[in-house]
UniProtKB/Swiss-Prot annotation:
GO biological process per UniProt: base-excision repair
Lineage: superkingdom: Bacteria
Residue positions binding Zn(2+) 3: H179, D226, H228
Family classification: Belongs to the AP endonuclease 2 family.
Binding site for Zn(2+) 2: E142, D176, H213, E258
Keyword flag Oxidoreductase: no
EC number of this enzyme: 3.1.21.2
Enzyme superclass (EC): hydrolase
Binding site for Zn(2+) 1: H66, H106, E142
Protein name according to UniProt: Probable endonuclease 4
Cofactor note: Binds 3 Zn(2+) ions.
Naturally occurring in which organism (per UniProt): Photobacterium profundum (strain SS9)
Length: 279
């Protein structure tokens, strides 16, 4: 009945949000990610979506929608920037209509036409504009692998954007483990993962962490290769994910599985849950 209801990748909620892990976080899209324009949400769709969420126990803080891949909030070309901003505001409005409070997005690219700081400033301006147009929804910046001219791969990039946001209660970060590793932050052991997130805390602040994407990496450390792998089968290994499931700093945020093989999602989720049980 509701075609756009769930774009479920396979995910889990960290233990203190729901002790029995019944509540599952959701990776979700509000429209086709490869189109600029979609028809407005109809009221019956909105009503049905909210009813389904209530029926299955999905709370807004456990749903992490992702915006269109076409959007570039740091685009140096005025016409394309305006198009991206309009699309981003539309995504926020859709979230607000559906009762969702988070919107995950890739920050943008300078396209080798402006410097990084100017690109980061445009992204911050774009977020501020969206906040003025749409209430309540939090803009959740996803870190990147640093491929091409993408910004957001250094923790300093994320901090520079956040520093320029007027309402800091409505901005956050989603850390993708594959992107983090590909960007040069080591996650290959529990000790290395602790060091990396200590640096994140110092540069950005753990209080801004609003969600995570859990992926192993096909690329090596610092490769800038955005190629997800199944947990434990890539260059990162299991120790990182054991640490994330057991460390208290990651309580109460959605942890979304974005790995490549749907046939083993259930096994991956069971393994992650076993780390909590064995704590």
């Amino acid at each position: 009945m509701v075609r756009m209801f769930l774009q479920l990748v396979g995910c889990l909620m960290h233990r203190k949000m729901q002790p029995k892990l019944v509540l599952t976080p959701l990776h979700y899209i509000t429209k086709n990610q490869r189109q600029w324009v979609a028809k407005p949400l109809e009221q019956d769709v909105i009503t049905a979506f909210k009813a389904r969420c209530q029926q299955y126990g999905f709370k807004s803080e456990a749903i992490l929608p992702h915006d269109s891949y076409l959007i570039n909030l740091g685009n140096p070309e005025t016409e394309k920037l305006e198009k991206s901003r309009a699309a981003f505001i539309d995504e926020m409005q859709r979230c607000n209509q559906l009762g969702l409070t988070l919107l995950n997005f890739h920050p943008g690219s300078h396209l080798k036409k402006i410097n990084e700081s100017d690109c980061l400033r445009l992204i911050a301006e774009s977020i501020n504009m969206a906040h003025q147009e749409v209430p309540e929804v939090v803009a959740v910046i996803e870190n990147t692998a640093g491929q091409g001219s993408n910004v957001g791969w250094r923790f300093e990039h994320l901090a520079e954007i956040i520093d320029q946001i007027e309402d800091k209660s409505r901005v956050g970060v989603c850390i993708d483990t594959c992107h983090t590793f590909a960007a040069g932050y080591d996650l290959r052991s529990e000790a290395a993962t602790e060091v990396t997130f200590s640096e994140f805390d110092q540069v950005v602040g753990m209080s801004f962490l609003r969600g995570m994407h859990l992926n192993d990496s096909k690329g090596k450390l610092g490769s800038h290769l955005d190629r997800h792998h199944s947990l434990g089968e890539g260059e990162i290994g299991w120790d990182c994910f054991r640490y994330l499931m057991q460390a208290s700093g990651f309580d109460n945020i959605p942890l979304v599985l974005e790995t490549i093989n749907p046939d083993i999602w259930q096994q991956e989720i069971m393994m992650l849950r076993s780390f909590v049980a064995s704590e």
